[in-house]
């Protein structure tokens, strides 16, 4: 079929990750149709909101370069251009960052991930220590959290659960309004995972809180909750979440998060790449110990991220997002 990518692997990625389903034609878009959809959306956006129409020759030149992958726009925007991106601009961003320093960090992460945007997060002590303590007792109540069938509905329900847990209450969860697994998602594309991943997240979160009664959540517990949130974002059996977690150099539990057979006891940890965040130059003993920990883990984690170096470029408190991954210390030969 014309408009496809010659390289079969690249074409598979384009079809499986970015092409929308054409209901009337009972097929997926070709790569050319995906590129056209993206440009149609952006040109309409510029015209409607800024009263700007780029030169047609420039548009055609840009289209050709995107088609041949010489330059690429935000791939999240390529995936969502149309009704999904029109509904929520968050769906147009590749990456984001959030410190886990507020009870809202968790449900906001869920919403951002469900929009298709990657999330970098930090469970450094300076952030996690701002969270409220878990009550001395947590008991079941007659309160019912009703989950609405939308991204906002899922995030809102999770926010309600967390608020109740921090108030010492375990509510009942009503997921009767959610569409079944396999149902087509017409706006975002793909198919629904059904209510089970959300139920699993709620159960997991309740368990973590029960184990933390009378104290604040630890960084590793916040990390695990964030990773479990990432598990929810599965569309048609395909993982759609990208995450990276930053932690302190002296956080031994985070350093060992992917040591041993971690995937058996904590499979949710596969959802995030982990890096230690250096805010100042460590002494040689610390540095060597971190590299030895990385080697001993057999997973290549934690990675090493120099926050101070980034601070020279950006004066804000924001740190990193899911795209830094292991480009931090992987060199690509040309």
Locate each region found by the language model.
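Extended catalytic cores of very large enzyme megasubunits
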Residues: 1-312, 316
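Positively charged, low-complexity/disordered segments
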Residues: 317-334
């Amino acid at each position: 079929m014309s408009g496809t990518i010659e390289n079969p692997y690249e074409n598979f990625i384009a079809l499986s990750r970015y092409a929308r389903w054409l209901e009337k034609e009972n097929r997926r878009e070709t790569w050319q149709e995906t590129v056209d959809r993206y440009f149609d959306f952006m040109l309409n956006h510029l015209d409607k909101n800024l009263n700007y129409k780029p030169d047609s020759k420039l548009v055609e030149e840009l289209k050709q370069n995107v088609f041949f992958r010489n330059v690429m726009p935000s791939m999240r925007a390529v995936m969502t251009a149309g009704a999904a991106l029109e509904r929520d601009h968050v769906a147009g961003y590749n990456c984001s960052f959030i410190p886990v320093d507020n009870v809202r960090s968790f449900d906001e992460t869920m919403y951002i991930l469900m929009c298709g945007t990657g999330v970098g997060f930090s469970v450094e002590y300076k952030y996690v220590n701002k969270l409220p303590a878990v009550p001395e007792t947590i008991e079941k109540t007659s309160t019912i959290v009703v989950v609405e069938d939308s991204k906002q509905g899922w995030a809102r329900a999770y926010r309600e659960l967390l608020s109740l847990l921090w108030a010492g209450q375990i509510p009942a969860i009503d997921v009767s309004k959610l569409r079944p697994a396999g149902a087509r998602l017409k706006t975002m594309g793909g198919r629904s995972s059904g209510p089970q991943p959300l139920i699993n997240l709620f159960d997991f979160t309740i368990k973590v809180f029960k184990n933390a009664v009378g104290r604040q959540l630890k960084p590793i517990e916040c990390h695990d909750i964030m990773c479990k949130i990432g598990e929810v974002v599965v569309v048609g059996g395909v993982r759609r979440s990208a995450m990276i977690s930053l932690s302190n150099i002296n956080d031994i539990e985070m350093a060992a998060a992917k040591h041993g057979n971690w995937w058996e006891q904590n499979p949710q940890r596969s959802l995030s790449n982990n890096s230690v965040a250096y805010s100042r130059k460590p002494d040689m003993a610390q540095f060597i110990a971190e590299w030895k920990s990385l080697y001993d883990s057999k997973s290549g984690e934690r990675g090493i991220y120099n926050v101070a170096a980034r601070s020279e470029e950006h004066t804000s408190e924001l740190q990193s997002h899911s795209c830094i991954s292991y480009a931090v210390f992987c060199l690509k030969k040309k």
